[in-house]
Structures are given as C-alpha cells and as structure tokens.
C-alpha cells in the first residue's frame, strides 16, 4: 500500500502588512499506513502550518507551492490537496484525513449535543438515518472511553471535563474511519494524568482503528512515549528525520540536541538549573569586566 500522505517540497508563504512571510520552506515528508510520525519544533517553526496544509485549512492569505499527495482510505488512489477543488477537499476531510485540534473547548460547538456533532460528520458524507447515526455515535463514544455513552451522547460540551472533551473530538475524527489523523498539540491544555490517557487513546487510533497519526508537538517526552518516527522543524525548514530510537540516541543536529536537553529528567532538575544560573552569572561577570 502507498504512503498515506506524501509531502513534496512544500512551501507556504503568508502575505502580511509587513511583507511576505515564509512559514514553511521546502519540507518533504511521508507517512506510511499505521505509522505515528511526530513533527516537533519550537513555536513558529512551521509544524502546525505543515499539518494544516494536509487538510487545506490555511487562510486566504497563504500561497502554497510543492505538492501534498493524500491517499484515499482504500490506499488505491491519491489527490494533490494543493490543486483539488473545494468540493473535492470537503469530501476528503473526515473520510480520508481528520484533525484533532489543540483546544477541545473551542473545537466543539456549545449549542449542540456531542452526539449531534458526531453525526454531522456522517451526514456530510452520505445519507444516514437518525437511528443509525445515533447508534454510531454511541458506539464511537464507547470505543474512545466515554462512560455511559447511551446517556452522554445527548449531553452538551460544557457537561464534559477537559479530557472527556478531547475524547469526544477524537471520536469525531474517528467516526468516518479515516486513514490519517492529524493531532495538533492534543494534550497541551490537559493535566499530566489526562495527557497520558489521551496519548494512550491516540496509540489505540493506530492499533485498533488502523489510522496513521501525525502528532504535532514541542514536548519530546510525548514523542518518546508515542512516536515511531520523528521530523524536526526549525525556522520553517525540516532539519532532521529519524526513527525515534535513533533520534534520541544519536541526534545529528545541534537544534535537535537542544530539544532533547530540554526534557526534564528526574533528579537532574535542580542541578541543571543551578548550572544554567552559574553560566549566566559568569557571562554577566565577563560582560561587566569588559565594560
């Protein structure tokens, strides 16, 4: 089976009042079926823009070049997301690729029940009866770990905790059985215990649902727990790619080494902080002496 998505020499430029800004420059990536690829980098590195391009979720001010070849869920055909029509893009969303957003509270509509919002995706891609849609919504809520789904399907977003809301958002992404799920910082707004549960659910998206996952994050600890392969972005460019074991054991780029050094290690936090403070003090003293 071919790659779920193949990004070839992607460039994204935004027109701003201060001039053109190159947010993504010459990025090439592939994701195999059933693979979890983590795209990491600091804020502003271009990782989220790269991911949103796969779903055609860029603003009108964006100008793109290159190609983003998205495979259909059968793996038998592919389309270039950058050149297809709006109708074709709409058909691909949800069915071939779906997105899990960073903030579940803003991703969910507060005036509709979660069941209605799950069924909305089904209705957008074909005729489905009210009874059938409700049954599918209950089933997917159960599969993502929402307790008492027969009752909770009629609840509104404000009646769920933050972690449960993220589970609902993941359920919405999974209901049409897409081949690829793009998760943009899916654990940032959650406490550490709930983060672990959501990461386990994303792993199940691959193991039980058969979906490939692109995980956008700056948290290298999350990468170590979940990813099969890692792509490192810095200042709009892809600077390093490797399987997760190789990247953590022998990173090639200095930027990657700095990212890995930012991961807190039990027992080393205080010593590292003291050492950094000492380095800053010596630097200030040297600067004062020169002055």
What are these regions (language model features)?
Residues 3, 20, 78, 147-151, ...:
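Short catalytic/signature loops enriched in Gly
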Residues 75-98, 116, 124, 246-251:
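ABC ATPase NBD coupling module
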Residues 132-151, 261:
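Conserved ABC ATPase "signature" region
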Residues 175-179:
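A short, proline-enriched helix->beta-strand linker immediately N-terminal to the Walker B motif
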Residues 196-209, 221:
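Helical segment within the ABC ATPase nucleotide-binding domain
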Residues 223-225:
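A short, surface-exposed alpha-helical micro-motif characterized by mixed small hydrophobic
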